[in-house]
Amino acid sequence: DAAADTLTIRFIDNGCGIDAETVQKVINPFFTTRTTRKVGLGLPLLKQNTEQTGGSLDIQSEKGKGTTVTAVFGLTHLDRPPMGDLAGTVVLTASAYPDIRFIFHYQNDKVDYVFDTKEVNEALDGISIQEPEVIEYLKEMIESNISEE
């Protein structure tokens, strides 16, 4: 939202959700539910990055219903990390988990684009989203649709 000088990233899942007590714990870098390693840095680093730009991190979750993580950054703040390769990240994630439906919604003052793996898989008509040619095509498709040029 350029008018508000904010960049908002929202992750929504309809998974198992977490209880209120755990929501408070997940922003601690030394808390994790994983058994492979004892540190969970994803959300703590996201929180740190939002706050260093004057933004915030909000986590809403309900056990059995899912979780919504909203990260708000200062859009023009000098310390806001660059967006990076959004298209590549979306396609890599979608192709790594082909049985999960991913919806990527990119919106700003000039662009409003939705990438939905349900629609993609229907269009592919049995061709795997994991095929290298499909991955490259989808990456180019997303890049062209979110380009502001």
Whereabouts are the PLM-identified features?
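Short beta-strand-loop-beta element adjacent to the nucleotide/active-site pocket used for signaling
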Residues: 1-9
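Polybasic/polar functional segments that serve as interface/processing modules
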Residues: 7, 49-52
